[in-house]
């Protein structure tokens, strides 16, 4: 009996590994990291009491599924030299379905198993996986650094102060103060004439 929603898996051959790139130049890695790291975030809106209203400056968290799809895209395109249709305007972002075709076939385990198929394939597999881990480490470091900068308490506090002292915010606060002053004057006037 066939399973429903079965993923069409992608398998690599010994020739695929022989033709693979085992080293991506540093500046190509930097280009990949620059292109991908800045979009691997989700914005969180946090209010002082957890309700909807005047929000504090945004905080950010890592979007791990985007990062996984970017990394799989890099493995497939840069190292294995295979094509896929990128999504969302970047050459390395795989669709979730394409990601599942490779991840569901345990692509990294396929490469690991090639180590047992002779010295040539073993060396290629070791070199490819080592260089890919370097790329992954660079992406992780960049995402971590960006998250730290974006979620920095002092920076967020400065944004909050800036938002509260903008000309628009100041004008709104001034209008509220004028309204309160008028109410106060009316109350004061009412007391002096004996009205309550």
Model-derived segments and spans:
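Intrinsically disordered, low-complexity linkers and terminal tails enriched in Pro/Gly
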Residues: 1-5, 193-196
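N-terminal "first-domain core" detector
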Residues: 2-65
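Short, surface-exposed, charged amphipathic helix/loop patches that serve as local interaction elements
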Residues: 37-196
């Amino acid at each position: 009996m066939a399973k429903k929603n079965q993923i069409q898996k992608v398998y690599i051959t010994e020739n695929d590994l022989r033709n693979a790139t085992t080293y991506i130049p540093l500046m190509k890695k930097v280009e990949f990291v620059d292109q991908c790291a800045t979009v691997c975030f989700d914005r969180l809106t946090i209010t002082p009491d957890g309700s909807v209203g005047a929000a504090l400056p945004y905080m950010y968290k890592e979007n791990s599924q985007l990062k996984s799809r970017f990394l799989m895209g890099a493995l497939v395109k840069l190292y294995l030299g295979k094509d896929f249709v990128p999504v969302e305007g970047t050459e390395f972002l795989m669709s979730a379905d394409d990601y599942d075709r490779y991840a569901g076939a345990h692509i990294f385990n396929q490469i690991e198993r090639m180590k047992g198929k002779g010295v040539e394939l073993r060396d290629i597999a070791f070199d490819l996986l080592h260089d890919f881990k370097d790329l992954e480490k660079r992406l992780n470091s960049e995402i971590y650094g960006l998250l730290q900068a974006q979620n920095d308490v002092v920076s967020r506090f400065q944004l909050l102060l800036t938002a509260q002292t903008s000309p628009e915010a100041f004008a709104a606060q001034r209008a509220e103060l004028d309204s309160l002053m008028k109410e106060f004057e009316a109350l004061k006037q009412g007391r002096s004439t004996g009205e309550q």
